[in-house]
Regions:
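Conserved CoA-thioester-binding segment of acyl-CoA-metabolizing enzymes
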Residues: 1-44, 56-58
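An acidic, glycine-rich surface segment that forms the CoA-thioester-binding/catalytic face
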Residues: 17-21, 25, 52-95
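Acidic-histidine catalytic/liganding microenvironments
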Residues: 30, 49, 87
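Short, active-site-adjacent cap segments at secondary-structure transitions
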Residues: 43-47, 99
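Short glycine/serine-rich donor-binding loops of glycosyltransferases
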Residues: 102-103
Length: 109
């Protein structure tokens, strides 16, 4: 699984948390898969956490948002931070900065 936003230091916009949750749920239920590796595109950052530019747009009203979609899924940041005990390993291949929620991903796997 590659976080592919190198121009934004692989920060995650709100919708991506739910997309990652869906992908990881599929991974958990796919018997042929034994391990998942998560990494960031580019060489500068693994993940800079939440997309703060998007957050500022929400606060100033320049971007509309569904408040329910803005919340993290029950499994936490990027669908990972509260996903303990699922049984299948997730490896964080950290290639650069891991800031905020990006560091949270690393701590949990």
């Amino acid at each position: 699984m590659t976080i592919n936003r190198p121009s934004a230091m692989n920060s995650l916009p709100s919708a991506s948390h739910w997309e990652a949750e869906a992908l990881l749920s599929w991974y958990d239920n796919e018997p042929s898969l034994r391990v998942l590796i998560i990494t960031g595109a580019g060489k500068k950052a693994f993940c800079a956490g939440q997309d703060l530019i998007e957050q500022a747009e929400f606060r100033t009203g320049t971007k509309e948002v569904d408040m329910a979609a803005r919340r993290h899924p029950p499994s936490g940041f990027a669908g990972i931070s509260r996903r303990m005990g699922k049984g299948k390993p997730i490896i964080a291949a950290v290639n650069g900065f891991a800031l905020g929620g990006g560091f949270e991903i690393c701590l949990n796997w």
